[in-house]
UniProtKB/Swiss-Prot annotation:
This is Phospholipid phosphatase-related protein type 1. Keywords: Cell membrane, Cell projection, Glycoprotein, Membrane, Transmembrane, Transmembrane helix. Pfam families: PAP2. One of its GO terms (molecular function) is phosphatidate phosphatase activity. Glycans are attached at N162. InterPro entries: P_Acid_Pase_2/haloperoxi_sf, P_Acid_Pase_2/haloperoxidase, PA_PP_rel. GO terms for biological process: nervous system development; phospholipid dephosphorylation; phospholipid metabolic process; signal transduction. It comes from Danio rerio. May play a role in neurite outgrowth and neurogenesis. It comes from the Eukaryota. Its main location: membrane. It is a multi-pass membrane protein. The keyword Transmembrane applies. Belongs to the PA-phosphatase related phosphoesterase family.
Length: 333
């Protein structure tokens, strides 16, 4: 093993175990509390009488959707993981990209017999950051839904509000007490969590993250259209997922747009600021000669030679030529 491509570090394993894994566990735990418990109560939002935007037909449970949530969540989690895993192994096997990878990444020596290969480091880093961002996106979405309590387009059909005692004869009358529903409480609670769209956020986060990975790491010399087609296909799938939510009256258009902005923002932040555009953390640029700038002036201006100086120099050159040619030849045969 080349000594110039290794780096000894005894802190990387403890930092990974006691810092990064703890942060990851806390993120997963917070996402679990948002998803599976009622620890965080939903804001009860009022509504207008017979609001046309809330009178859309009930599309049925989420499991009856054209894009079922369980399948969507499995795809947005498994597809990027598989692409990153296969991509890193393929680049490591190929000679040209493998040498470039070794030039960017150093093998970490953590003990007398323990080494962290650059391939393992990159796979753990890219997939780990992706998983963290996926749970973070879920937390942001759930927090927004709990805080706003925005109503779904089908809210009034499942709420079945009890208008008894309320003078609700005009559609412009606002009912501040939004807790007058007589319908199924589980369905009503789900209808209060519309903003932002979770499916749109998770799908666009996954698509943008993988698109950044493909465009930044995978190099193809034989085909110019393979990467664009793959990346645009992923982005199109995420876009169609959001449109499906609107077409089935499960989310408002603004909910889907907010989900797109949230998911893409998190993916861009992690891809650019955290994993450095999927480049190596220990790049080895060519060493250049260090120049000593001490003693030089703070500012220098280009020297412009005047015409008089040019003519004077030419005159001196001509005189020297004439003197040389006028001297007799002192060499004899």
């Amino acid at each position: 093993m080349a000594s110039d491509n290794t780096h000894r570090s005894y802190s990387i394993i403890p930092c990974f175990i006691f810092v990064e894994l703890v942060i990851m566990a806390g993120t997963v735990l917070l996402a679990y509390y948002f998803e599976c418990t009622d620890t965080f109560g939903i804001h009860i939002q009022g509504f207008f009488c017979n609001d046309a935007d809330l009178l859309k037909p009930y599309p049925g449970p989420e499991e009856s959707s054209f894009i079922q949530p369980l399948i969507l969540y499995c795809v947005v989690a498994a597809a990027p993981t598989a692409i990153i895993f296969v991509g890193e192994i393929s680049m490591y096997i190929m000679k040209s990209t493998g040498e470039a990878l070794l030039a960017q990444e150093k093998t970490i020596v953590t003990g007398e017999c323990c080494y962290l290969n650059p391939l393992i480091r990159r796979i753990i880093r890219f997939i780990g950051v992706f998983a963290f961002g996926l749970f973070a996106t879920d937390i942001f979405v759930n927090a927004g839904q709990v805080v706003t309590g925005n109503l779904a387009p089908y809210f009034l059909n499942v709420c079945k509000p009890n208008y008894t005692g309320l003078d609700c004869h005009f559609s412009h009358q606002f009912i501040a007490n939004g807790n007058i529903c007589t319908g199924n409480q589980v369905v009503v609670e789900r209808a209060r969590r519309s903003f932002p769209s979770k499916d749109a956020s998770l799908s666009v986060y996954s698509a943008v993250y993988v698109t950044m990975y493909i465009t930044s790491t995978i190099k193809t010399k034989s085909s110019r259209l393979a990467k664009p087609v793959l990346c645009l296909g992923l982005l199109c799938a995420a876009f169609l997922t959001g449109l499906n939510r609107v077409s089935e009256y499960r989310n408002h258009c603004s909910d889907v747009v907010a989900g797109f902005i949230l998911g893409s923002s998190i993916a861009l932040f992690l891809g650019i600021c955290v994993v450095n555009n999927f480049k190596g953390t220990h790049s080895t640029p060519t060493k250049q000669k260090q120049e000593d700038y001490r003693g030089l002036p703070l500012m220098t201006f280009p020297r412009v030679e005047s015409p008089l100086e040019t003519l004077s120099a030419q005159g001196k050159s001509c005189q020297a030529t004439l003197l040389t040619s006028s001297q007799p030849n002192t060499w004899s045969a």
